[in-house]
Structure formats: structure tokens, C-alpha cells
Amino acid sequence: MGLSLHPQIDNGLTKGQPGFPGGKLYCHCPSNKIEVTLGSDVLHNHACGCSKCWKPAGSLFSVVGVIPTDKVSVTANSDKLTIVDSEAVIQRNACSQCGVHMFGRIHKEHPFKGLDFVHAELSDTKGWQEPQFAAFVSSIIEQGFKPEGMDEVRAKFESVGLKTYDALSPALMDAIATWTAKRAGKL
């Protein structure tokens, strides 16, 4: 198979370390790197095929997890951060020089407000939670991927043990529905 889903997936998954304490993420600039410190491991780490997430060059998917907002702090070169799309629900903070997305934060009322979206692959520390599933898989078609190649994409995910969804995982979709029902007074 010639396609690259993501470097952390293409050759099989590396299991994370239980109780992993977190670490630092760095942009790709050769010097004066943005540094973001994460005070815990990520949760719900997954491959994402949406058109908004940052992806390594040549990859069809990003790998992104969430972490409580209070566990995220910018610890160097915050002046280089810029918001990619100020109208998006997830405010993706990227390096204004190299373009790497450092973290995404939700400021509006949303089921995931209080969680930041991060790419643990930007860390030089090993042990982060491995991807757990693949989300928004069909969305790569909207970005120009040929529909007839989707069986190969799904088979490649399945070969490394990842279930594929065209939304989020059932647990995350349940969390969204629960939040919505509570806000509507149904729960």
C-alpha cells in the first residue's frame, strides 16, 4: 500500500505508558521553538481525517488527543502563536512561522469545552497514549482523496487494530448527546 495514514500508524502502533505524566510539545521551527507543556497524558487520542487538523506532510490523517485545559500551558515563545480560524469552534493555535498547530481550545459553549486538542507527536518524549480509533474517515474524500480508495484506508486502519468512524467514537458521541440532553432539560 502506497498511502500514508500517519507516521504513528503506518507501521503499527506503539503502546503508551500507563500513568504517563505528560511532557512538552515543540513547533517545527529550527530555533526559538514554541513550547507547550502538558501536565498529563492525552485522552481519546485518535486519527482524524477532518480538513481542519494539522497533519504531517504526506499524511492523510492527523493524530490528535484531548487534555484538560488546566493541564496545558505555553512555556516558551507564546508571541509566535496565531489562531488559524477565529470563526471555528476549536480555536487552533499555530506557530506563525512553521504553521504547526500547537493546541486547539474551545471558548464557546460546547460539550468539549474545557478540553484542549493537541498533537502528542510534537513531543520528543515517548509514552503518550497511542491512537484509539479513527474519526471522520470519509472526510478525506472532501479533501480530494478518491472514494474508490476508501476500502484500502479502512483496511489499513483495521490492520493495526483501529476501528473507523465517520464521526467520533461511540463514547464521544454519547458524551455529546448527554451534554445536549442535559442542556435541553431532558436528563
Swiss-Prot record:
Role, per record: Catalyzes the condensation of formaldehyde and glutathione to S-hydroxymethylglutathione.
Pfam families given in the database record: GFA
Entry's family note: Belongs to the Gfa family.
Gene Ontology MF annotations: S-(hydroxymethyl)glutathione synthase activity; zinc ion binding
Cofactor stoichiometry and binding remark: Binds 2 Zn(2+) ions per subunit.
Residues annotated to bind Zn(2+) 1: C27, C29, C95, C98
Pathway it works in: One-carbon metabolism; formaldehyde degradation; formate from formaldehyde (glutathione route): step 1/3
Lineage start: Eukaryota, Fungi, Dikarya, Ascomycota, Pezizomycotina
Cofactor field: Zn(2+)
PANTHER family, per the entry: CENP-V_GFA DOMAIN-CONTAINING PROTEIN-RELATED, GFA DOMAIN-CONTAINING PROTEIN
Binding site for Zn(2+) 2: C48, C50, C53
EC number: 4.4.1.22
Catalytic activity: S-(hydroxymethyl)glutathione = glutathione + formaldehyde
UniProt-recorded name of the protein: Putative glutathione-dependent formaldehyde-activating enzyme
InterPro entries assigned: CENP-V/GFA, Formald_GSH, Mss4-like_sf
Domain named CENP-V/GFA: residues: 20-166
Keywords from the UniProt entry: Lyase, Metal-binding, Zinc
GO biological process, one term: formaldehyde catabolic process
Keyword match Nucleotide-binding: no
